[in-house]
């Protein structure tokens, strides 16, 4: 799209013809012709198709910016904002625990968090100290980090699935002075107790008898019952740019990293979600996501903390209870992530799926292949798909329901929100540079790395990084938009269409090249999963000795050994190109997922198609016979020797 050139040419022609003495109507008509001929018509088309969307997005951006500016000038923090909300509506339900039925009003959440703040100050903790929080998602989880924040103490929110070395690593890198763990996590803490050091204070919360408490652990609940519940006489000198808590990355590509969440980032994420999807003051939000991640704790719980919505928590997603919970608690907004929507679709059809009041589903990772099936099947009018990591400064949101899109950036107002797709070497993920040393922007339709220009003075564009300086530096590139600037590297490849809609491409390693073609793992996964009734599927490329590229391999959940590979292959041939059909199959009891329901492929890729690495059933596609054959050590050796044509 050559809008600057088109505009310049049309204005120049208008002036020239006017100087030659032609009537202005003729001059204008000629100038318009030059404009259209120079590519301007495409620009007008884009304006007509996207103006409404872009203006709404601009209004959201301005609204969030003004709210943040007001809170910064007032010296607010997230706890202060919450206290104002609690004072306005003390008796409204703030948090509901769907697992236990326990309900907390805003006054109760405020009182509990006040007790936490007073207790830890009495124990000698000072603003800036770190306390690790390790318990399942329930109201106490929110009250603990909120209370610590009231005292200026930074909470390190630990993934409840961590065990042994990763758990000890996360505790060590956080520099925590204390650990608060739930009774349900006692066994996990016991496994690493010798690695934690005697200086680490331990507090246990929840239903756990004194005889079951680990040595050197104090019972937190009785201590909180004795602590003052009045607001702190003097709040710590904290502001919107100070640290609120740490959230750990999922660790799918290595050990988890502690991402720094400052008060303004918490506000920004929650506010963008609230305004982008027009949430209402009387909404009830269903949050079954982990609270140790930003989707559940900021996008979800943030609606309670900042805007006063009621949030219904369930500590662990349950496909069979999802819609029952929504009906029971009159939920109007639900959250999803990863494969949750697919899990819901594969449940038996029940009447309750249509008796709910849910109008909006907010999240990320909804596959385009099941997008409309989900909205039509469950009667959910709006999907609020968004893209953004906890620490990133280039989040985007799909505000108008464009199927398959994870968000947009305006093609008209490109500089209002300075993010960009840049060309990269997809093997190394290093940005490519032009002759001036700047990154090369992608054209519509070209896949590129999403980057966001950094401005530490702007709460919408700052990048706070990680506790580890080296990890932070790896995510920053310089001279990206212009000489001397800096930008955040998302690590994710997206594609933008002509209208500015962006579509998520797989992370590096999730596409592979086979028979001269690029194979999208998500596309193959979606096809296989649909053929098999929304079964869990992981698709990845594996190297075969002496063969160029990588062969496709599919790991399929088959807990009851019911899958017939060759019946599946007959259907697969109808819907997948030959180069995309998996050469290898691995049938296993279940496919590993992360705590946020993303497929884990690291171990599967490492073990490949070697039967010595697994007891799972393996199959190999013999192209001559046109069928999958069992793959044992003898067949494996023949494949590696090149006896089969792949």
From Swiss-Prot:
EC number: 6.2.1.15, 6.2.1.3, 6.2.1.-
GO cellular component: basal plasma membrane; caveola; endoplasmic reticulum; endoplasmic reticulum membrane; mitochondrial inner membrane; plasma membrane
GO BP annotations, alphabetical order: adiponectin-activated signaling pathway; biotin import across plasma membrane; biotin transport; export across plasma membrane; fatty acid transport; glucose import in response to insulin stimulus; lipid transport across blood-brain barrier; long-chain fatty acid import across plasma membrane
Places the protein is found: Cell membrane; Endomembrane system; Cytoplasm
GO molecular function: arachidonate-CoA ligase activity; biotin transmembrane transporter activity; efflux transmembrane transporter activity; fatty acid transmembrane transporter activity; identical protein binding; long-chain fatty acid transmembrane transporter activity; long-chain fatty acid-CoA ligase activity; nucleotide binding
Region (Sufficient for oligomerization): 191-475
Activity regulation field: Inhibited by Triacsin C.
Tissue: Expressed in muscle.
Predominant cellular place of this UniProt entry's protein: membrane
Reactions catalysed, as given in the entry: a fatty acid(in) = a fatty acid(out); (9Z)-octadecenoate(out) = (9Z)-octadecenoate(in); hexadecanoate(out) = hexadecanoate(in); (5Z,8Z,11Z,14Z)-eicosatetraenoate(out) = (5Z,8Z,11Z,14Z)-eicosatetraenoate(in)
InterPro entries in UniProt: AMP-bd_C, AMP-bd_C_sf, AMP-binding_CS, AMP-dep_synth/lig_dom, ANL_N_sf
Segments on the Extracellular side according to the record's topology features: 1-13
NCBIfam families: PRK08279.1
UniProt family annotation: Belongs to the ATP-dependent AMP-binding enzyme family.
Described function: Mediates the import of long-chain fatty acids (LCFA) into the cell by facilitating their transport at the plasma membrane. Also functions as an acyl-CoA ligase catalyzing the ATP-dependent formation of fatty acyl-CoA using LCFA and very-long-chain fatty acids (VLCFA) as substrates, which prevents fatty acid efflux from cells and might drive more fatty acid uptake. May act directly as a bona fide transporter, or alternatively, in a cytoplasmic or membrane-associated multimeric protein complex to trap and draw fatty acids towards accumulation.
PANTHER family listed in its UniProt record: LONG-CHAIN FATTY ACID TRANSPORT PROTEIN, LONG-CHAIN FATTY ACID TRANSPORT PROTEIN 1
Name of the protein described by the UniProt record: Long-chain fatty acid transport protein 1
Organism: Rattus norvegicus (Rat)
Organism taxonomic ancestry: Eukaryota, Metazoa, Chordata, Craniata, Vertebrata
